[in-house]
UniProtKB/Swiss-Prot annotation:
Single GO MF descriptor: CMP kinase activity
Species name: Halobacterium salinarum (strain ATCC 700922 / JCM 11081 / NRC-1)
Protein name: Cytidylate kinase
Subcellular location field: Cytoplasm
EC number(s) given by UniProt: 2.7.4.25
InterPro entries: Cyt_kin_arch, Cytidylate_kinase_dom, P-loop_NTPase
Gene responsible for this protein: cmk
Amino acid sequence: MLVTISGPPGSGKSTVASTLADHLSYEHISGGDIFRGLAEDRDLTLAEFNELAEEDPQIDKDLDRRLRETARGRDDIVLESRLAGWMAGEYADIKIWLDAPMSVRARRIAEREDKTPAAARAETEAREESETQRYEEYYAIDFDDITIYDLSVNTARWGPDAVTDIVLDAVDAYQAERDEGPTPIENVRYQF
């Protein structure tokens, strides 16, 4: 089974995906870890690398191609990134969307990255705007359209363990033979 976990920064994607993968004994593949690793390889901050990605479309496209190829060729994985649901597309068995209000996400990011909530919020808003524009430009993806997801969870309402339990319940209840087919993802340009 291929499960995707998507959502904006600070929504709890990595936490839930890691715990879910452990529970299922699946491999956890994180697009964010790959992206951060590429930034570190160049001795750039995440903000600096994101700016570079704005100028060099191939950075995003290489990462997204890897996600799509992973989804096409692998099983028993939890694939986690902002675009995991979109890139996995028809190959995903279950696509999960996690979200929380910006104030909650900014606080989480501030705690994780040892910065003020105001700084985290400003950086996150700029990053989201930049990435949303790039997704539209490169792939014709409307990032605000969450209808491609099978389950959406507001992670501000429950703690990480409870969110993981909600997702596990959905995964456990999934029966491929009763599935009416993959959620159609139309008009996306998978050109890398």
